Design a protein with these regions (language model features):
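A low-complexity, Ser/Thr/Gly/Pro-enriched, surface-exposed linker/loop concept
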Residues: 76-93
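Early exported N-terminus immediately downstream of N-terminal targeting peptides
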Residues: 26-81
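Bacterial N-terminal signal peptides
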Residues: 9-18
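Surface-exposed, polar helix/loop patches in the mature regions of secreted/periplasmic/lumenal proteins
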Residues: 88-148
Length: 149
């Protein structure tokens, strides 16, 4: 379990530290009840955007059923839209971490209500000092400690 946690931590750290690396694959639609799915749909195929979705083989390795991320370079309209979607989705969510600056969220970690008893859902969000937006959606048989330890 420690190896899985360590590997997952490295994967998440790589996403936040090197957001431009991986190529995008065709996106499968997120849960229909989440507004952040609109961010993936609206910006996923635009210039200066990297979208990542892990294959089933990778997901099983980490105890996940879905992993999807998007990185958007310096787009103020996308930032406003993403923050609006996050605000809508965080209602009813467990706020694990949230950092604001000048009235706007710059870093957030939410646990959303699950659709199935043993499947948890998480949203991670970060805006870098250079204006790079990173949004991550994770579903799986994980708890918040698995993602932060």
């Amino acid at each position: 379990m420690k190896q899985i946690r360590y590997t997952l931590l490295v994967l998440l750290a790589a996403l936040f530290l090197f957001p431009y690396g991986a190529g995008a694959t065709d996106a499968e639609v997120l849960q229909k009840d989440l507004k952040i799915q609109d961010v993936f749909q609206r910006y996923g195929r635009k210039k200066n955007v990297t979208m990542v979705e892990l294959s089933n083989e990778m997901l099983e390795t980490y105890g996940m059923t879905r992993y999807k991320s998007i990185t958007i370079k310096n787009d103020p309209d996308a930032l406003r839209f993403t923050r609006q979607c996050l605000e809508a989705d965080q209602k009813g969510a467990r706020k694990i971490k949230e950092v604001t600056d000048d009235g706007g969220v710059i870093s957030a970690y939410y646990q959303l209500p699950g659709k199935e008893a043993d499947i948890n859902r998480f949203v991670l969000f970060k805006v870098s000092s250079k204006g790079v937006i990173t949004l991550v959606y994770i579903e799986g048989d994980l708890d918040s400690d698995d993602l932060i330890t």
